[in-house]
Amino acid sequence: MEKYNREEFEEVIVDIGRVTKVVKGGRRFRFTALVVVGDKKGRVGFGFGKAKEVPDAMKKAVDDAFKNIVEVKLKGSTIPHDIEVKFNASRILLKPASEGTGVIAGGGARPVVELAGIKNILTKSLGSNNSANVVRATIKALSMLKG
């Protein structure tokens, strides 16, 4: 496992969820956090953390994200070719865009492509828009790009 300098990376919280367990004495809450980390130079990863408190869940998610970092092959400020990838019920379509287009992405795909360092891209989320699966599908697509 490669060690990364955490100062080079930015982190974005994509989703924080709350789960409630009802017990005799009342309700017990637990939290989940989905975090994307990237250095805007072609390295990006995501992590999932669960804990009884939000800050603990976020810390676990960031630690998990550094275990799942992938290298993205860029062509200038965009991607080399079109790609469509399916992860569970989520499908994501990524298309290269000309200079000046910007990042056209929504939901969980936007933080992934921005933190990967892509400046011009068109994305379309097809199928399920579950943010965790969209993030996973986007990272899977970026890792499958051929330079």
Swiss-Prot record:
Recorded hits in SUPFAM superfamilies, A to Z, give: dsRNA-binding domain-like, Ribosomal protein S5 domain 2-like
Q: Which GO terms describe its biological process?
A: translation
- Keyword annotations from UniProtKB, A to Z: Ribonucleoprotein, Ribosomal protein, RNA-binding, rRNA-binding
Cite a GO CC annotation: small ribosomal subunit
Superkingdom to which the source organism belongs: Bacteria
Instruction: Please verify whether the record's keywords include Coiled coil.
Output: no
Presence of the UniProt keyword Ribonucleoprotein in the record: yes
Residues of the S5 DRBM domain: 9-72
List the PROSITE patterns.
RIBOSOMAL_S5, S5_DSRBD
One MF term from GO for this chain?
rRNA binding
By its UniProt entry, which InterPro entries does this protein fall under?
A: Ribosomal_Su5_D2-typ_SF, Ribosomal_uS5, Ribosomal_uS5_bac-type, Ribosomal_uS5_C, Ribosomal_uS5_N, Ribosomal_uS5_N_CS, Ribsml_uS5_D2-typ_fold_subgr
Q: How does it assemble?
A: Part of the 30S ribosomal subunit. Contacts proteins S4 and S8.
Family statement: Belongs to the universal ribosomal protein uS5 family.
Per the record, the domain comment is: The N-terminal domain interacts with the head of the 30S subunit; the C-terminal domain interacts with the body and contacts protein S4. The interaction surface between S4 and S5 is involved in control of translational fidelity.
* Protein purpose: With S4 and S12 plays an important role in translational accuracy.
Write the protein's name: Small ribosomal subunit protein uS5
